[in-house]
Protein backbone atom coordinates (compact mmCIF):
# COMPACT_ATOMS: atom_id res chain seq x y z
CA UNK A 1 0.00 0.00 0.00
CA UNK A 2 1.24 3.52 -0.80
CA UNK A 3 2.05 4.70 2.71
CA UNK A 4 2.16 8.40 1.82
CA UNK A 5 -1.44 8.21 0.59
CA UNK A 6 -2.64 7.11 4.03
CA UNK A 7 -1.74 10.58 5.31
CA UNK A 8 -4.77 12.83 4.84
CA UNK A 9 -4.32 15.77 2.49
CA UNK A 10 -5.31 18.72 4.67
CA UNK A 11 -5.70 22.40 3.76
CA UNK A 12 -4.40 25.38 5.76
CA UNK A 13 -5.52 28.99 5.18
CA UNK A 14 -2.57 31.37 5.12
CA UNK A 15 -4.40 34.08 7.07
CA UNK A 16 -3.88 35.13 10.66
CA UNK A 17 -7.48 34.16 11.45
CA UNK A 18 -6.58 30.47 11.13
CA UNK A 19 -3.39 30.54 13.16
CA UNK A 20 -5.11 29.39 16.39
CA UNK A 21 -6.43 26.32 14.55
CA UNK A 22 -2.92 25.26 13.45
CA UNK A 23 -0.61 26.56 16.17
CA UNK A 24 -1.52 23.74 18.55
CA UNK A 25 -1.00 21.13 15.83
CA UNK A 26 2.61 22.25 15.49
CA UNK A 27 3.03 22.14 19.28
CA UNK A 28 1.76 18.56 19.58
CA UNK A 29 3.54 17.22 16.50
CA UNK A 30 0.23 16.28 14.87
CA UNK A 31 1.22 18.19 11.73
CA UNK A 32 3.65 15.37 10.95
CA UNK A 33 0.63 13.13 10.34
CA UNK A 34 -0.81 15.44 7.65
CA UNK A 35 0.10 16.24 4.08
CA UNK A 36 -0.46 19.99 4.48
CA UNK A 37 -1.29 22.44 1.68
CA UNK A 38 -1.16 26.17 2.44
CA UNK A 39 -3.11 28.61 0.28
CA UNK A 40 -5.86 31.23 0.15
CA UNK A 41 -9.43 30.34 1.23
CA UNK A 42 -10.62 30.41 -2.40
CA UNK A 43 -7.87 28.11 -3.71
CA UNK A 44 -8.26 25.63 -0.83
CA UNK A 45 -12.02 25.55 -1.34
CA UNK A 46 -11.49 24.75 -5.03
CA UNK A 47 -9.00 21.99 -4.18
CA UNK A 48 -11.34 20.37 -1.66
CA UNK A 49 -14.29 20.49 -4.07
CA UNK A 50 -12.12 19.11 -6.89
CA UNK A 51 -10.84 16.23 -4.74
CA UNK A 52 -7.23 17.42 -4.52
CA UNK A 53 -7.65 17.69 -0.73
CA UNK A 54 -9.38 15.24 1.61
CA UNK A 55 -10.08 17.61 4.50
CA UNK A 56 -9.80 21.33 4.94
CA UNK A 57 -11.32 24.73 5.38
CA UNK A 58 -13.92 25.74 2.82
CA UNK A 59 -15.63 29.11 2.52
CA UNK A 60 -19.27 28.94 3.54
CA UNK A 61 -20.62 29.73 0.06
CA UNK A 62 -18.50 27.02 -1.58
CA UNK A 63 -19.49 24.54 1.13
CA UNK A 64 -23.20 25.25 0.57
CA UNK A 65 -22.80 24.98 -3.21
CA UNK A 66 -21.18 21.55 -2.76
CA UNK A 67 -23.05 20.33 0.32
CA UNK A 68 -23.88 16.98 -1.32
CA UNK A 69 -20.17 16.10 -1.56
CA UNK A 70 -18.93 17.47 1.80
CA UNK A 71 -19.43 16.71 5.50
CA UNK A 72 -18.82 19.55 7.96
CA UNK A 73 -16.82 19.10 11.17
CA UNK A 74 -18.91 19.96 14.25
CA UNK A 75 -17.76 22.73 16.59
CA UNK A 76 -15.01 24.16 14.39
CA UNK A 77 -15.27 27.10 12.00
CA UNK A 78 -14.02 30.63 11.47
CA UNK A 79 -16.73 33.08 12.37
CA UNK A 80 -17.79 35.82 14.72
CA UNK A 81 -20.58 36.82 17.05
CA UNK A 82 -20.51 40.55 16.42
CA UNK A 83 -17.34 42.25 15.13
CA UNK A 84 -14.85 40.10 13.23
CA UNK A 85 -12.17 42.79 12.62
CA UNK A 86 -10.95 41.17 9.38
CA UNK A 87 -13.95 41.44 7.02
CA UNK A 88 -14.76 45.08 6.39
CA UNK A 89 -16.23 47.67 4.07
CA UNK A 90 -13.99 50.73 3.96
CA UNK A 91 -15.90 53.74 2.66
CA UNK A 92 -15.40 57.41 1.85
CA UNK A 93 -19.16 58.08 2.16
CA UNK A 94 -22.01 56.69 4.33
CA UNK A 95 -23.08 53.21 3.19
CA UNK A 96 -26.61 54.34 2.31
CA UNK A 97 -25.10 56.74 -0.24
CA UNK A 98 -23.35 54.04 -2.29
CA UNK A 99 -26.18 53.51 -4.82
CA UNK A 100 -24.55 53.44 -8.26
CA UNK A 101 -21.14 54.15 -6.70
CA UNK A 102 -17.98 52.19 -7.52
CA UNK A 103 -17.20 49.55 -4.90
CA UNK A 104 -13.94 47.60 -5.16
CA UNK A 105 -13.91 43.93 -4.15
CA UNK A 106 -10.43 43.13 -2.90
CA UNK A 107 -11.07 39.42 -2.82
CA UNK A 108 -12.76 36.66 -4.73
CA UNK A 109 -13.91 35.15 -1.41
CA UNK A 110 -17.54 34.55 -2.29
CA UNK A 111 -18.77 34.46 1.30
CA UNK A 112 -17.50 37.87 2.39
CA UNK A 113 -18.44 39.42 -0.95
CA UNK A 114 -21.96 37.95 -0.83
CA UNK A 115 -22.37 39.14 2.77
CA UNK A 116 -21.25 42.66 1.83
CA UNK A 117 -23.55 42.72 -1.21
CA UNK A 118 -26.47 41.41 0.85
CA UNK A 119 -25.98 44.04 3.55
CA UNK A 120 -25.61 46.89 1.06
CA UNK A 121 -28.64 45.89 -0.98
CA UNK A 122 -31.09 44.72 1.72
CA UNK A 123 -30.01 46.60 4.81
CA UNK A 124 -28.83 49.86 3.23
CA UNK A 125 -30.96 49.78 0.05
CA UNK A 126 -28.16 50.46 -2.45
CA UNK A 127 -26.95 48.78 -5.65
CA UNK A 128 -23.31 49.78 -6.23
CA UNK A 129 -21.22 49.11 -9.32
CA UNK A 130 -18.85 46.33 -8.18
CA UNK A 131 -15.48 45.42 -9.65
CA UNK A 132 -12.65 43.14 -8.51
CA UNK A 133 -9.07 44.31 -7.93
CA UNK A 134 -6.01 43.52 -5.77
CA UNK A 135 -6.47 44.33 -2.04
CA UNK A 136 -4.42 47.55 -1.99
CA UNK A 137 -6.49 50.09 -0.07
CA UNK A 138 -4.73 53.26 -1.25
CA UNK A 139 -5.13 52.24 -4.92
CA UNK A 140 -8.72 51.14 -4.37
CA UNK A 141 -9.66 54.47 -2.86
CA UNK A 142 -8.31 56.30 -5.93
CA UNK A 143 -10.89 54.58 -8.14
CA UNK A 144 -13.72 53.60 -5.79
CA UNK A 145 -15.98 55.14 -3.17
CA UNK A 146 -15.75 52.01 -1.01
CA UNK A 147 -13.88 48.72 -0.84
CA UNK A 148 -14.55 45.26 0.59
CA UNK A 149 -11.49 43.66 2.19
CA UNK A 150 -10.95 40.37 4.01
CA UNK A 151 -8.21 38.67 5.97
CA UNK A 152 -4.94 40.36 6.86
CA UNK A 153 -5.53 43.23 4.38
CA UNK A 154 -8.82 43.99 6.16
CA UNK A 155 -7.14 43.85 9.55
CA UNK A 156 -4.56 46.38 8.34
CA UNK A 157 -7.32 48.63 6.97
CA UNK A 158 -9.23 48.33 10.23
CA UNK A 159 -6.35 48.94 12.62
CA UNK A 160 -3.90 51.08 10.62
CA UNK A 161 -4.82 52.43 7.16
CA UNK A 162 -8.49 53.34 7.68
CA UNK A 163 -7.80 55.63 10.64
CA UNK A 164 -4.66 57.00 8.93
CA UNK A 165 -6.58 58.01 5.79
CA UNK A 166 -9.68 59.20 7.68
CA UNK A 167 -11.91 56.51 6.14
CA UNK A 168 -14.97 54.88 7.70
CA UNK A 169 -14.41 51.19 8.45
CA UNK A 170 -17.57 49.08 8.75
CA UNK A 171 -17.21 45.59 10.24
CA UNK A 172 -19.27 43.03 8.28
CA UNK A 173 -19.72 40.79 11.33
CA UNK A 174 -21.06 43.69 13.41
CA UNK A 175 -23.40 44.85 10.60
CA UNK A 176 -24.83 41.31 10.24
CA UNK A 177 -25.25 40.89 14.02
CA UNK A 178 -27.06 44.26 14.35
CA UNK A 179 -29.34 43.30 11.47
CA UNK A 180 -30.19 39.67 12.32
CA UNK A 181 -29.10 39.17 15.93
CA UNK A 182 -27.10 36.13 14.78
CA UNK A 183 -23.43 35.14 14.66
CA UNK A 184 -21.82 34.63 11.25
CA UNK A 185 -19.72 31.81 9.78
CA UNK A 186 -17.15 32.62 7.08
CA UNK A 187 -15.57 29.18 6.67
CA UNK A 188 -16.17 25.67 7.95
CA UNK A 189 -13.91 22.63 8.15
CA UNK A 190 -15.11 19.73 6.08
CA UNK A 191 -14.14 16.35 4.73
CA UNK A 192 -15.04 15.09 1.31
CA UNK A 193 -17.92 12.68 1.80
CA UNK A 194 -16.18 9.93 -0.18
CA UNK A 195 -13.04 10.30 1.96
CA UNK A 196 -14.97 10.32 5.26
CA UNK A 197 -16.77 7.13 4.21
CA UNK A 198 -13.52 5.46 3.12
CA UNK A 199 -11.41 6.63 6.10
CA UNK A 200 -13.82 7.25 9.00
CA UNK A 201 -11.23 6.71 11.75
CA UNK A 202 -8.63 9.06 10.22
CA UNK A 203 -11.33 11.68 9.53
CA UNK A 204 -12.45 11.64 13.17
CA UNK A 205 -8.83 11.82 14.37
CA UNK A 206 -8.18 14.89 12.22
CA UNK A 207 -11.34 16.49 13.61
CA UNK A 208 -10.23 15.75 17.18
CA UNK A 209 -6.74 17.11 16.45
CA UNK A 210 -8.15 20.42 15.20
CA UNK A 211 -10.42 20.76 18.23
CA UNK A 212 -7.50 20.06 20.58
CA UNK A 213 -5.31 22.56 18.71
CA UNK A 214 -8.01 25.23 18.85
CA UNK A 215 -8.51 24.71 22.58
CA UNK A 216 -4.76 24.76 23.34
CA UNK A 217 -4.24 27.90 21.24
CA UNK A 218 -7.04 29.79 22.98
CA UNK A 219 -5.77 28.70 26.41
CA UNK A 220 -2.32 30.04 25.48
CA UNK A 221 -3.50 32.91 23.27
CA UNK A 222 -0.82 35.29 24.60
CA UNK A 223 1.91 32.90 23.35
CA UNK A 224 0.21 32.60 19.95
CA UNK A 225 -0.02 36.40 19.71
CA UNK A 226 3.58 36.86 20.84
CA UNK A 227 4.88 34.51 18.14
CA UNK A 228 2.66 35.99 15.42
CA UNK A 229 3.72 39.55 16.34
CA UNK A 230 7.31 38.66 15.37
CA UNK A 231 6.42 38.53 11.67
CA UNK A 232 3.19 40.55 11.45
CA UNK A 233 2.56 44.31 11.34
CA UNK A 234 0.49 44.14 14.54
CA UNK A 235 1.50 44.11 18.19
CA UNK A 236 0.78 41.29 20.64
CA UNK A 237 -2.20 43.00 22.28
CA UNK A 238 -3.92 43.63 18.95
CA UNK A 239 -3.38 40.03 17.87
CA UNK A 240 -4.58 38.60 21.19
CA UNK A 241 -7.71 40.75 20.90
CA UNK A 242 -8.22 39.56 17.33
CA UNK A 243 -7.80 35.86 18.16
CA UNK A 244 -10.31 36.12 21.02
CA UNK A 245 -12.75 38.21 18.94
CA UNK A 246 -12.95 35.46 16.33
CA UNK A 247 -15.42 32.67 17.08
CA UNK A 248 -14.07 29.21 16.23
CA UNK A 249 -17.22 27.33 17.28
CA UNK A 250 -19.77 25.65 15.04
CA UNK A 251 -22.81 24.74 17.11
CA UNK A 252 -26.56 25.42 17.11
CA UNK A 253 -26.37 29.27 16.92
CA UNK A 254 -23.87 29.09 14.06
CA UNK A 255 -26.03 26.56 12.20
CA UNK A 256 -28.99 28.91 12.61
CA UNK A 257 -26.89 31.70 11.10
CA UNK A 258 -25.92 29.48 8.15
CA UNK A 259 -29.61 28.66 7.60
CA UNK A 260 -30.52 32.36 7.62
CA UNK A 261 -27.71 33.31 5.24
CA UNK A 262 -28.68 30.48 2.86
CA UNK A 263 -32.33 31.56 2.94
CA UNK A 264 -31.37 35.10 1.96
CA UNK A 265 -28.73 34.45 -0.71
CA UNK A 266 -29.02 30.80 -1.82
CA UNK A 267 -31.19 31.18 -4.94
CA UNK A 268 -28.96 33.97 -6.33
CA UNK A 269 -25.68 32.30 -5.32
CA UNK A 270 -25.97 28.76 -6.65
CA UNK A 271 -27.53 26.66 -3.87
CA UNK A 272 -31.05 26.02 -2.53
CA UNK A 273 -32.43 28.37 0.12
CA UNK A 274 -33.09 25.30 2.30
CA UNK A 275 -29.74 23.57 1.67
CA UNK A 276 -28.98 20.88 4.25
CA UNK A 277 -25.73 20.95 6.24
CA UNK A 278 -24.55 17.46 7.21
CA UNK A 279 -22.23 17.20 10.21
CA UNK A 280 -19.62 14.50 10.78
CA UNK A 281 -21.06 11.92 13.15
CA UNK A 282 -19.09 10.99 16.30
Curated annotation (Swiss-Prot):
It holds the Pfam family VitK2_biosynth. PANTHER family: CHORISMATE DEHYDRATASE. It comes from Streptomyces coelicolor (strain ATCC BAA-471 / A3(2) / M145). Its EC number is 4.2.1.151. Disruption phenotype: Cells lacking this gene require menaquinone-4 (MK 4) for their growth. Belongs to the MqnA/MqnD family. MqnA subfamily. This is Chorismate dehydratase. Keywords: Lyase, Menaquinone biosynthesis. It comes from the Bacteria.
Amino acid sequence: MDNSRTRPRVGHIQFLNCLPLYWGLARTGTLLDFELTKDTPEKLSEQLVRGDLDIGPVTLVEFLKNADDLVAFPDIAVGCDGPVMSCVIVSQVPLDRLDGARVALGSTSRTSVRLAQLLLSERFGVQPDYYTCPPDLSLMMQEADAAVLIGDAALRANMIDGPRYGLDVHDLGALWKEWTGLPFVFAVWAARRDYAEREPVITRKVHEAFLASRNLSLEEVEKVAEQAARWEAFDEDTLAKYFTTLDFRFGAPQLEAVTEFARRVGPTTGFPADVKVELLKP
